[in-house]
Regions:
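The feature marks helicase ATPase cores and/or their adjacent C-terminal helical subdomains
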Residues: 1-175
Length: 175
């Protein structure tokens, strides 16, 4: 049974997709397929700096990987949390280790494996130090990026709000 109504595709996005697919001359069968009620929005911009991505969910698409290449660098310079096909922009464990370090500083007991991982990020343990001073085995650029994201109000305990992908790689994805 073919699907009659989308639960993901907003009307503006479907309209644009239909304008593109209507140019395909192959033997396509016409289908009745209704978008979800939400309108959605398509922003076609040629400069990332013209877009305020500090709020909301974003899906940044480009046709090829070479076109995507400068985007993560820009997002990092703006202190924005994002994900690519390679994962999120800070890696899996650094934010967790900061949380564990804060617990260790308060005298809370944490699992031994996590404690060892935290201690590997520093030369010597000093509970008086904030994570960004204590973690001297973490690159300064990474610490600056993390502090910038936190200052921007990014919630690093959740999935990133911004996804960066090729059009092909995003098939089925949504912002």
């Amino acid at each position: 049974i073919p699907l009659q109504q989308s639960e993901r595709v907003p009307s503006e996005i479907q309209l644009k997709a239909l304008q593109i697919i209507d140019r395909v001359q192959d033997n396509r069968l016409s289908k009745d397929y209704l978008p979800k009620k939400e309108a959605g929005e398509i922003l076609m911009q040629f400069k990332l700096s013209a877009i305020d991505m500090t709020k909301g969910d974003w899906l940044i698409l480009a046709r090829t990987n070479p076109l995507l290449k400068p985007i993560p660098k820009y997002l990092k310079s703006m202190g924005l949390f994002f994900e690519t096909a390679q994962g999120n922009s800070i890696g899996k464990t650094l934010f967790e280790d900061i949380d564990y370090w804060n617990k260790m500083r308060k005298g809370e007991k944490i699992p031994e494996v996590q404690e060892q991982r935290v201690l590997e990020r520093m030369s010597k343990r000093d509970n008086k130090l904030e994570w960004y001073d204590a973690f001297d085995h973490v690159a300064l650029s990474k610490k600056d990026y993390l502090r910038s994201m936190l200052a921007n109000g990014e919630d690093l305990s959740k999935k990133p709000r911004i996804k960066v992908s090729t059009i092909h790689g995003a098939k089925g994805g949504e912002a």
